[in-house]
Amino acid sequence: MSEKVTIKVERKELHLPTIALRGLVVFPNNLVHFEVGREKSIAAVEWAMANNSNVFLVAQKEMETSEPTQQDLYTYGVVAEVKQVLRVSDELVKVLVEGKYRAKLTELDTTGDFLLSAVRSAPVRAAKPEEAVETEALLRALKTGFDEYLGMNPRLAKDVVFTIVSSDDPMFLTEYMPANLLFRYEDKQAVMNENTLNGRLQRLVEMLRRECQVMKIEKEIAEKVNESMDKNQRDYYLHEQLHI
């Protein structure tokens, strides 16, 4: 089952130990820590480490599912290298992984000690020459949207901000931004599911706009609550003063 014995052909299937992720989406070229508690997931990590194999990481559709089948998992995930494993207890392991490349789940075997996936490399299609103008426009819209997002999230990590602001590589940004910004995991998976660069850019632009709209409404609600509290406190103070 080791990945290394598989002939490296672009559309060749690999059979990899698999971890079904709850509320987490891992993208290529990103380092991620997470905890593993299910027996089959721990077994997958241990087998990968013992056999110098990569793993396939794919998100569950429902976090409550304890024993996922193929229908319970999304189709697209990431082939990743296990960089570090720390056993916290008999029932919990902390794992550090690095996403390598996007892959498509074609078959899932749930009968063994761990989940075993048949996967194929699924690179995102770059923009065609005739789509270059659209790509540039989407990239500009993405940068504008991020500027607005940043204005409402001033505590965002400086290294994340610098990386995004200084990069003009759209393919890189469509992996780095969803991996490092506070989007819902369902939204991150929606980006993972997109098969084209421009499709991903469009999805990210929409996500940033939605997040900014939500944050504006949240701010307005908070301001109204504070005004109401201030008024109640003033009324209470005046009421008490009248009784002195």
PLM feature segments, named:
Residues 1-244:
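N-terminal low-complexity, acidic/polar interaction/targeting segments
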